[in-house]
Amino acid sequence: MSKSAVSPMMQQYLGIKAQHTDKLVFYRMGDFYELFLDDAVEAAKLLDITLTTRGQMDGVPIKMAGVPFHAAEQYLARLVKLGKSVAICEQVGEVGAGKGPVERKVVRIVTPGTLTDSALLEDKETNRIVAVSPDKKYIGLAWASLQSGEFKTKLTTADKLNDELARLQAAEILLPDSKNAPQLQTASGVTRLNAWQFAADAGEKLLTEYFGCQDLRGFGLDSKEHAVSIGAAGALLNYIRLTQNLMPQHLDGLSLETDSQYIGMDAATRRNLEITQTLSGKKTPTLFSILDGCATHMGSRLLALWLHHPLRNRAHIRARQEAVTALESQYEPLQCHLKSIADIERIAARIAVGNARPRDLASLRDSLFELAQIDLSATGSSLLETLKAVFPETLPVAETLKAAVMPEPSVWLKDGNVINHGFHPELDELRRIQNHGDEFLLDLEAKERERTGLSTLKVEFNRVHGFYIELSKTQAEQAPADYQRRQTLKNAERFITPELKAFEDKVLTAQDQALALEKQLFDGVLKNLRTALPQLQKAAKAAAALDVLSTFSALAKERNFVRPEFADYPVVHIENGRHPVVEQQVRHFTANHTDLDHKHRLMLLTGPNMGGKSTYMRQVALIVLLAHTGCFVPADAATIGPVDQIFTRIGASDDLASNRSTFMVEMSETAYILHHATEQIIVLMDEVGRGTSTFDGLALAHAIAEHLLQKNKSFSLFATHYFELTYLPEAHAAAVNMHLSALEQGRDIVFLHQIQPGPAGKSYGIAVAKLAGLPVRALKAAQKHLNGLENQAAANRPQLDIFSTMPSEKGDEPNVDCFVDKAEEKHFEGILAAALENLDPDSLTPREALSELYRLKDLCKSVS
């Protein structure tokens, strides 16, 4: 395209667009942001705005679309949610200041990971940007949140990368534009940067300059050992600088994170436990949504962070527990204060990047005064004492803001009325001139009459000649020497004095001068506030922590959560545990025990579909997770030993993008667990092997269960419909059979959701199908076919060879028939036991008792 064939304004646009080819350019023209050419076409489609034309280029109409300046945020929010980045190009020159178009430049770039405007952010979600820098052995990660000032780095490996990204929930990911860039399994927006931007040397230079240090050892980073992490952190910091058009001043140091700090959870586990998102992608009901009673958005975000980062450090957990206990008696007064607290964390971020608004400062002022009033009595909690000691430190900032900012300032700085009265004498004078000009004129008139003795003297104003002193013709010749003639009339003369001229200049320009001075003073206030950012961030974190801890305290009281105990030996003992989410969704929830220790490491869980197996397993994992956040747990009592990680393999779906079937996804997740599980890991396995043929699935499930028992020795909850596996406790003392009970009443079934010892008697699949609404004809056909299969299995059961053996540790092929037949025997024993268990002789009439006796006799014949 030829620039010479278009207007100067369009030439300017094309020059700016050439520097931002991968972004939409919002080009400020008066009260609109305009988009041109391909940007206009794309924006019109994404935002459903009108596409029009303006002028021509090379004989082709130039396509154009626009959004109003005052409503730009809502359009930016929509674009960012779609993963788009937008360059904001503002008018920075004076209109009509010279020839050609007004000067414009890109003042910032809005990307999914670098948002600070409250209108573009979810109140309860942390917005992070992550940089990924790979080498042959390791992958360096660095992530930051411009809203909180978080800035961290970590070394990881390729097989753990996607799990780390799932944990961090990145809004934007920076990758080197090279062949060595790792493959990601994430929906987050990916931004490609030149590979040289991830160079460790350049990264270390930028980071040391930013933090004002000689090297990064003080942050735990060695230039050789952590080279890829340093490269990632440098690329990230530089990207933030370029997009914000300034170097951020609020990044809270650079910390090195390690696996030993938190209980590990892979991406599948976070998804299956529905911590902050349901399996269907919704925000509720989740663990977070059910627990979140926080009074502040800062508290809600910290709660989500704690849930995704359960602690390993027992001392830190106990400190939180002590705080929760101490807050039980102080919850109400604390909530009264917290409910009045604004989002200090995000206000501080906007101050840091220079886009804070007047009402941000007013909210900050009021919040700091409110925090200073929090007076927790002697708590006995060292954590609470530390937190409450932070708030008085910000009182000087609050006092400064009280002096500087109006009690209720305007929304926009351009409207004035932002800087408080008495803060600056010149501004007060300009306002006095604007608001009290008539008083000045009357005072001047009285003063001049007294000075000159001229009785006809009047001080007046008109739009043509401005301010003047008018004297009658007879007294005009007596005017003082400092009176300068301005206009001669038939019966009067008009004069101007230096004092009146100065006043005129002030009045005529007072509004513009006042607005300009207010902007200057406001910028000065922001500059001073930036020096207090560490204190503001500290106060925000303390307020958020108090909010979460008080929420934990309320949960303990309102929902009967108890303080879990921690042991140094392997154990998961839970008395009457409850699922924290499900119990809030149903009228009555059946509580259940859990007992795992060094003697019983694998619970083989059987029972009907809809019986509650998956709920029970998730319940155990969530109780363990909550205990390690410092929260009390939904149970009558709980004792938990050392836990490093939680793994789940519950449900699956096709991964069409990677050409992987449901069964392949299941096996991949299972393989990861078997390779990584240790004695201090909790494993949940739900119906492993169901996606293939019966014998294949059974053989795999058997081998996986044995691997968990013999090799991994993890605490495992293993739910299955393969009743043939229920023999395992006979071969392995560390395995125990448990089942979810159900009760048949005629042709109906009642799920008791109660964990009981031993294997289940049957799966009740047809009964569940009936509940699902299958046609009666199909149900009858299924029952008939089931009866035939059961009879055939009983009739064709072969005599066991006395030399049949179980698979050995030396790698022998498993004798599937052996454990199938043995399990069938156990299965029929379970049926008889269940029949007897459900029999109540005292409630039977003689005829009913005789009928039950014949039924039991027939049942015995069928299994003999």
From Swiss-Prot:
GO terms for biological process: mismatch repair. One of its GO terms (cellular component) is cytosol. One of its GO terms (molecular function) is damaged DNA binding. The keyword ATP-binding applies. Keywords: ATP-binding, DNA damage, DNA repair, DNA-binding, Nucleotide-binding. It comes from the Bacteria. ATP binds at G607, P608, N609, M610, G611, G612, K613, S614. Pfam families: MutS_I, MutS_II, MutS_III, MutS_IV, MutS_V. Belongs to the DNA mismatch repair MutS family. This protein is involved in the repair of mismatches in DNA. It is possible that it carries out the mismatch recognition step. This protein has a weak ATPase activity. This is DNA mismatch repair protein MutS.
